[in-house]
Amino acid sequence: MKIYTKYGDEGFTRLYGGKRVSKTHVRVKAYGKMDEVCSLLGVIVAEIRENDKLNRVLGEICKECENIQQQLFDCGSDLATPDRLREYKQKIDDVRWLEQRMDEYIPLLPKLEYFIIPG
């Protein structure tokens, strides 16, 4: 598999199926952001896995993070596929699984009274 194509050298890229779009297209921006989140999850998982004590306590969360990473890759792939040129990988059960995880973890957080500023 080639990791570069040279199609993006002029500010354009190709979606699945060959459709050419600007690198500023909303689809491209969206799967770029998904890649960023996926990378951050990867760093978190790697840090936890390197620490035996943390890994024993948070190993199950690592598995969930890895599942979310796969879902992000699938969703990014779907975003790069215009007009359902193939069946989408992301399924409603994936969304339900993520919602269930959120419902499970949200009560463990302090009450949210305002938006959280990242950093």
PLM features: what roles do these ranges have?
Residues 1-119:
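Phosphate/pyrophosphate-binding loop motifs in nucleotide- or prenyl diphosphate-using proteins
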